[in-house]
Amino acid sequence: MVMTYFDFTEFWSSIWTKWHFHPDVLIGLAVILGLYLWIIGPGRIKLGLSDTPATSKQILMFVSSIVIILLSLISPLHELSDNFLFSAHMLQHILLTLIVPPLMIAGIPGWAFKPVMKIKVFAWIARLLTNPIITFSAFNLVFSFWHFPALYATSVDFHSLHVLEHLMFISTAVMMWWPLMSSSKELPPISEPAKMLYLLGLAIAQILVFAPITFSDVPLYEFYVNAPVIWSLNNLQDQQIGGLIMKVGGGVLFMALFIRIFLRWAQNERDNTKSLQKKQIEINSVKNKTSSSFISSVNS
């Protein structure tokens, strides 16, 4: 096989001109953003969803999620991931599955789902799709499935299949994050202890999927074996970096959230214990006063 090498300076100066304005991406994101703005604007009033409008922070988070999707799929990162580097593709996947969904969910007011929950069939489907067992399984199965080398290569070769892959990534990632971040009363998040178990499972799943990729002695993705070499990275090094990006990136994020939730839960438990102890002291004090009053009345 004859390897093609790019001059670093020439490549670096030209890569910034590689923007891919795919109509399906632009139209899809425009529809999603338009629907969101309608729901938090005219739709909120017309449907009587809430007297409380979406906050500036919520709007900023949702719009940020759309911008990140847009940049991930049309910017030079897309060119790098589709034609040169497996590691760039994994960075793209990190953005689409671990950064975009939390921002998107945090940007949706809890009252936005009231119309859906009024229809029994839709409410049943929504509860099913946000069940933590379903969300955990769906995300990890989809993520693992699309990283099988043969299917991965096919998705990169065919744009429509690649679009489907990204749609499945984002949709199942939103499902995966929902039990952790929901602000909806109708579709509430799980308890703090359950969140910790959930995050621990996600961290382990990331290791199981990407450890074989990271520690493989041979390149697993034929597509990148035949790709031009840039930045003096050979195929195996690129693959190892990609595996580390996913394994470490996902693991660090999940464990950081685990620690944060644990500390919050532990503090709440301490506060509850102190509150119960205080109430018990007050009850005992009232009992003692009552007993003293009774004894005094008897003696008198």
Region spans (language model):
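Alpha-helical membrane segments of multi-pass proteins
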Residues: 2-300
